């Protein structure tokens, strides 16, 4: 017996269509892979086709239940035919409650993976993940001497000088006026004169 997300039962199908979903999913296998290798606990797994999604919140955290649990709930519900009218709202509320509880529990257990975490040491070196735009990182860095005393500089100060930052968040590429043609022209001019000077030196040495 299959149950909707809202809890409405569909009595037309007695079993979950697992082989059909597994057989006709060549493109679905790629979509069920984890979105990023840095999230070790991704809810997208290969067994999603055999699961019933109960609840999904805005963070794409999903509360699952297996087909066996749904069949047990259906057998409990259909065991008393006379009390079917009272059992259906209770079943619906119970499923929604379990979905909410499971999704919140998933969020609690996985919330630590959203903060910067230490990558395991490789060859004795300790590497750290690049801080994202939401992280507060005000450590004095060797390649950013102006950030030692204060936080990230505002946009008006960054427009005049080049931002020597490895993070693209400080570049503000959508708001900057990029003057690439002038730079390329100057570089081409300098390169041309350098090559001419080099040719003269080599010609002078050859003669």
Swiss-Prot record:
GO terms for cellular component: ciliary transition zone; cytoplasm. GO terms for biological process: cilium assembly; epithelial cell migration; fibroblast migration; inflammatory response; negative regulation of cytokine production involved in inflammatory response; negative regulation of epithelial cell migration; negative regulation of fibroblast migration; negative regulation of inflammatory response. The modification Phosphoserine is found at residues 25, 167. It is found in: Cytoplasm; Cell projection, Cilium. Highly expressed in photoreceptors. The modification N-acetylmethionine is found at residue 1. Residues 1-41 are annotated as: Disordered. Pfam families: UNC119_bdg. The keyword S-adenosyl-L-methionine does not apply. The keyword Protein transport applies. It comes from the Eukaryota. Keywords: Acetylation, Cell projection, Cilium, Cilium biogenesis/degradation, Cytoplasm, Inflammatory response, Phosphoprotein, Protein transport, Transport. Regulates the macrophage function, by enhancing the resolution of inflammation and wound repair functions mediated by M2 macrophages. The regulation of macrophage function is, due at least in part, to its ability to inhibit glycolysis. May also play a role in trafficking of proteins via its interaction with UNC119 and UNC119B cargo adapters: may help the release of UNC119 and UNC119B cargo or the recycling of UNC119 and UNC119B. May play a role in ciliary membrane localization via its interaction with UNC119B and protein transport into photoreceptor cells. Belongs to the UNC119-binding protein family. Interacts with UNC119 and UNC119B; interaction preferentially takes place when UNC119 and UNC119B are unliganded with myristoylated proteins. This is Macrophage immunometabolism regulator. It comes from Mus musculus. The lineage of its organism: Eukaryota, Metazoa, Chordata, Craniata, Vertebrata. The gene is Macir.
């Amino acid at each position: 017996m299959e149950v909707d997300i809202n809890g409405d039962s569909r009595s037309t199908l007695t079993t979950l269509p697992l082989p059909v979903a597994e057989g006709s999913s060549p493109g679905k296998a790629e979509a069920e892979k984890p979105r990023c290798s840095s999230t070790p606990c991704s809810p997208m797994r290969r067994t999603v086709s055999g699961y019933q999604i109960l609840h999904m919140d805005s963070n794409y955290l999903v509360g699952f239940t297996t087909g066996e649990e749904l069949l047990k709930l259906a057998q409990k519900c259909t065991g008393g035919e006379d009390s079917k009218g009272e059992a259906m709202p209770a079943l619906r509320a119970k499923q929604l409650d379990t979905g909410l509880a499971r999704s919140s529990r998933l969020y609690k257990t996985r919330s630590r993976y959203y903060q910067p975490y230490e990558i395991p040491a490789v060859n004795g070196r300790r590497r750290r993940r690049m801080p994202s735009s939401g992280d507060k990182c005000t450590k004095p860095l060797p390649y950013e001497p102006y950030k030692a005393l204060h936080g990230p500089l505002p946009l008006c100060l960054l427009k005049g000088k080049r931002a020597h930052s490895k993070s693209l968040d400080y570049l503000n590429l959508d708001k900057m006026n990029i003057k690439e043609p002038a730079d390329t022209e100057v570089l081409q001019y300098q390169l041309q004169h350098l090559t001419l000077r080099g040719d003269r030196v080599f010609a002078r040495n050859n003669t």
